[in-house]
Design a protein with these regions (language model features):
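Short, solvent-exposed secondary-structure boundary/capping segments
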Residues: 103-110
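A glycine-rich beta-to-alpha transition motif near the start of alpha/beta enzyme domains, typified by
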Residues: 1-102, 141-166
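Active-site glycine-rich loop that binds ribose-phosphate moieties when present
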Residues: 111-130, 158-160
Length: 166
């Protein structure tokens, strides 16, 4: 499934047949030797809400929570009749509310745990202002004009900058 440019392999694991999600993610998400995806989403049983989401990055690391992945698993659960149009699921110990609207999914995210003051990062001769935001899943937020004065995304080497900033 695809969510805003991220692609995921989604598996119903309520039977708990998959015991090592990290190992499976490394194999199945490999774009050369596997199916290929940004991550693996396992839909598991929950005693609190409709289901629990376990998210693994393509390298097998535990991702905790991913908004795009959350929207994908919510649509998957609805399409497979695991959950209704409006439902709740668990991820990383938190409860998220999802609403299916035709082909779109609305997802209520957790309020940020912390937001840093503006910090600066030197990359070569460039000094970039950024903020760190922890929404239970860490994010770095940078104003696009730091890279391109007109704020245009065309020509921005996102993969290069993503690797540097990660």
């Amino acid at each position: 499934m695809s969510g805003a440019g991220n692609d995921f392999i989604v598996i119903d694991n309520r039977s708990a047949m998959i015991v090592d999600g990290a190992a499976l993610a490394r194999k199945i998400c490999d774009r050369h030797w596997g199916v290929g995806a940004d991550g693996l989403l396992l839909l598991e049983s929950s005693d609190k809400v409709s289901y629990r989401m376990m998210y693994y990055n393509a390298d097998g690391s535990y991702g905790g929570m991913c908004g795009n992945g959350g929207r994908c698993i919510a649509m998957f659960a609805f399409q497979k009749k695991i959950a209704g149009k409006d439902h709740k699921f668990e991820a990383l110990g938190h409860i998220y509310a999802a609403s299916i609207m035709a082909e779109d999914v609305s997802l209520n995210m957790q309020d940020p745990v912390s937001i840093s003051k503006i910090r600066y990062l030197s990359i070569g001769k460039k000094k970039i202002a950024y903020q760190f935001i922890d929404t239970v899943s860490p994010h770095i937020v940078i104003d696009i004009t730091e890279f391109n004065k007109n704020g245009d995304l065309d020509g921005l080497d996102i993969k290069r900058w993503g690797k540097i900033l990660r």
